[in-house]
């Protein structure tokens, strides 16, 4: 909400507004001549889209979706899917199935939607991970996770049972005292239960399970770099090692 509510934008129906916006974008791209549109949120009267697509192709639409309605919208309109929350390979597979089912119902090719994912990971040996997990920015991983999701892994959320994840992150509201209280309550085990961790080879094996679940564009993000320059300096090399191992494991996938 930090990009909407402080500036007076209505955030009460974000999914409905988003869907109408995507429909309108597609309409403008696919129409010739003036466009009239009477929607719940947007209205166009004799609007023109005179910029021609580059080489005859419109830009691909990528949607970051995790909830049921957004997954449905992804299947109807998106060219690529980049979820903001899929914490196990099984969860990823189930959500991808919803996207593809929606695409089929819309008469689209479900296999044409590219499944991607950034996998937040912690790459290092046990001693490194012990130190990394004490860093405030690493603990902040849990701010991205809804309380309901964390509860599935057997943990209560440090921000309380009503925490919704990304949409509740508003620096203007979260006081220094609230963040310090959050950091003091973070359990390292809660983070480790959520994200791939261990050696580059161990992380690669976990990411491989996501590829087996349908992931086709994996991106390994080593969050250990957030623990300070000591770890940031070697983070890229660790990711490269994990990606090289992943290439060996996935073969022709």
Stretch-by-stretch model annotation:
Residues 11-49, 90-209, 251:
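An alpha-helical appendage that flanks or caps ligand/catalytic pockets
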Residues 61-64, 81-83, 113-120, 218-221:
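Hydrophobic faces of well-ordered beta-strands that scaffold small-molecule active sites
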Residues 27, 79-80:
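Well-ordered beta-strand positions
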Residues 5, 85-89, 167, 219-234:
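Glycine-rich, proline-tolerant flexible connector loops at the mouths of alpha/beta enzymes
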Residues 78-79, 215:
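A structural motif
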Residues 1-9, 76-78:
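Acidic/polar active-site rim loop that often engages polyanionic ligands
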Residues 166-180, 227-253:
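Short acidic, glycine/proline-enriched helix-loop-strand junctions
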């Amino acid at each position: 909400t930090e990009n909407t509510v402080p500036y007076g934008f209505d955030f009460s129906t974000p999914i409905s507004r988003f869907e109408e916006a995507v429909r309108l974008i597609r309409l403008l791209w696919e129409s010739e001549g003036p466009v009239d549109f009477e929607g719940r949120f947007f209205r166009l009267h004799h609007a023109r889209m005179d910029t021609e697509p580059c080489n005859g192709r419109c830009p691909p639409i990528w949607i970051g979706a995790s909830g049921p309605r957004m997954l449905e919208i992804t299947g109807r309109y998106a060219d690529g899917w980049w979820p903001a929350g899929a914490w196990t390979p099984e969860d990823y597979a189930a959500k991808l199935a919803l996207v593809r089912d929606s695409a089929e119902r819309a008469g689209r090719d479900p296999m044409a939607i590219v499944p991607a994912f950034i996998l937040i990971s912690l790459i290092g040996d046990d001693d490194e991970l012990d130190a990394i997990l004490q860093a405030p920015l690493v603990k902040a991983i849990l701010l991205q996770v809804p309380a309901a999701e964390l509860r599935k892994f057997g943990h209560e959320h440090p921000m309380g049972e009503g925490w919704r994840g990304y949409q509740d992150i508003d620096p203007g509201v979260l006081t220094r005292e609230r963040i310090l209280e959050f950091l003091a309550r973070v359990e390292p085990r809660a983070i480790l239960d959520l994200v791939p961790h261990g050696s580059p080879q161990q992380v690669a094996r976990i990411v491989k399970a996501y590829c087996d679940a349908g992931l086709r564009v994996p991106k390994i993000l080593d969050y250990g770099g957030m623990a300070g320059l000591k770890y940031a300096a070697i983070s890229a090399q660790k990711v490269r090692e994990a990606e090289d191992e992943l290439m060996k494991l996935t073969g022709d996938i």
